[in-house]
Amino acid sequence: MISSVPKLQYYKLRDGASVPEFATEGSACFDLRVCWDTEEEMWGPIKGRNIKKWKKMLVPTGLAFNIPVGYSIRFHPKSGLACKHGITLTNCEGIIDSDYHHEVFVCVWNTSDENDYYLRQGDKICQAELVRNEHYHIEQTTEKPQKTTTRDGGFGSTGK
């Protein structure tokens, strides 16, 4: 029997890169970790980098992926980082396409108005999943979309 389970391959670009892995048997996503560029950045006086409050940072993972055609990798914030420290993804969800074969970086944002946050070598920075892409046609129409339900309004129109 031929397996229909896709295979996601990774390549370590630097020795310090961490293996992407699922935290538990029931985890929907695997974790990606910080991989700084040089020994000085990894083991220097602060052993990491400081994200100032309300600032953004592009964080290297040290990994490149061989993503199967027809799939993409989607990044999501780590709930603990977001709730406890205000660290989230700048773009809410990151997407890595199957034709991207370079190092994967994660763009994070410190939304805290109270504290800076130190990212150290090997810290979990986001969770990611392999997602099947659905391709579809996009075409212009000459007819304005018609109302198909009783809904009126836009933002906030469905209530609390």
Outline where the language-model segments fall.
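DUTPase catalytic domain/fold
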Residues: 1-160
